[in-house]
């Protein structure tokens, strides 16, 4: 049996848990976060299940991993993980992960107060205010909504 030790930081956003996975991140195939998400689901979903479900997580556990950006104009990218799956976008996860990353100096923003982040759903803009080592607030400009399909019959 293989043994793995993952370094994580746990936090919460208004009581909802968020876990940032720091170590043992897989090398994901793809040139976009959507493609990398697909690779994670296909080949590494055991990581999500191990860290989000009992006994290490619980039914509303949410979290993710930070990766370098695919586009150098962006600050970084996020892969969202939770008990329901590997999500294309998660507002709660974004707020928690950004707060952890800023307060722990895990990221260096290109512009103070603004982060350009790649997520599987597309690119998001995050605005924030930091005073000393604490993040005071986080605001998300989400991806545009779109029509994924029409005239479907169930």
What role is predicted for each listed range?
Residues 1-152:
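A glycine-rich beta-to-alpha transition motif near the start of alpha/beta enzyme domains, typified by
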